Amino acid sequence: MKPCILPWINFSTNTFGRPRVCGYSGVKTPTKLKDSDISTEWNSEYFKEIRKDFLNGEWPENCKRCKYVESLDGISKRMDENGFWYDQYKHLIDQTADDGSVPYEPPHIDVRTGMICNLKCIHCGTGASSKWQEDKALLDKYPNTENYQINNKWIEQEHGFWNHLRNTWHQTKRYNFLGGESFANKRHNEFLKDLSETEYAKDVNLAYVSNGTLITEDRLEQLSKFKSVVLRLSVDALERAGEYFRFPIKWDVYVEQLRLIDKFIKGKPNFDVGVQWTCSNVSMFYLVETYDIIRKEFPNIKFLFCNHVEWPIHMSAQNLPKEIKDVILNKINNYKFKDRDLDSFPFYVNHMMEKDLWKEHGKTLMQYLDDLDAARNISWNYSFQEMELHKYDPR
């Protein structure tokens, strides 16, 4: 097995500032960046052990998610990232010491910009969006609604971490920002503005996963100063279903936002923009319709199969009645996807069908939706009416 290149090039954090190799990491590290720094953590035992495991031809404990995807013949993050970066950076692997350490700073910085967010998506939760704190009745009731008492001032308000990044502008070639919502973070926005005005910007690659709601034409002009911009916009369902899923967006407003972006990037090869779809029980049902509208309405924006929900488990695509899974299979089998996607979507079908979690977690999903309705004055029965979930309510 070819090693994943990320442990040799990428330093990442979660929303609480814990170091990790990437967003799919399965091991929780004990240290937080507010108590340490990137240089120290880059050669921590966590990173060193992962490098050594890959060099020994073994899957690290940290990387179970990619191992699972590949076991179902899916395209894993390891495969994707190696496709982008392995040939460019494979020489760095040879610099690995016997203890797994490397003698250089990470060329890629992958930063979770805290929990500040303007949406509260139903497959997300309090650990990634501050807006969930509005739903007081749901706090501590579900796995994804834990009432965290986390001090994220180090990344959301204070300057120390961001100044550390400024000090390495001359050697960092790529920044990958995720939230929360990065464009809602004032310190991030200041950092981006400052970097865009330097001599280094033309040599820096940027990547974002964003909900897209805060991207303006001025912001796009600012981003255009960089060598390249990979922009991934989170979309899981359309119209009524999309408004419920990514509350409190308004679909018509969001469509205009996509039109603005689609128009701006036309003819600009340094922009790579795609909507990033995550497989869940709800988004799987609306996959074909969502794929179709992106395909037809936004010619410069790609549809990308990017992720699947494992947690909270009640939002997993495996947590659906068999009858609804059969409807989904029928819709997918009767739709002609683009040739470039024919190798991408089968994993999500295989994942959905691998397990039947409805008997164990169906009640939790239905109660969760009822609680969301009460907290947000919305209606799952209206928003997801095509699913006819009420027919299978096991309570």
Question: Where are the regions a protein language model picked out?
Answer:
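A structural signal for well-ordered alpha-helical scaffolds and beta->alpha junctions
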Residues: 34-35, 42-48, 56-63, 106, ...
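Alpha-helix termini
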Residues: 162-167, 195-201, 221, 262-270, ...
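Conserved C-terminal portion of the radical SAM core fold
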Residues: 15-16, 207, 226-232, 252-394
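Non-transmembrane alpha-helical segments in soluble domains
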Residues: 39-42, 64, 121, 166, ...
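N-terminal pre-core extensions flanking Radical SAM catalytic domains
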Residues: 1-151, 168-169, 341-395
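Distinct, well-ordered alpha-helical segments
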Residues: 187-193, 216-223, 286-290
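Core AdoMet radical
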Residues: 106-116, 125-157, 170-186, 198-217, ...
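Metal-dependent nucleotidyl/phosphoryl-transfer cores and adjacent nucleic-acid-binding surfaces
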Residues: 59-65, 76, 104-105, 176, ...
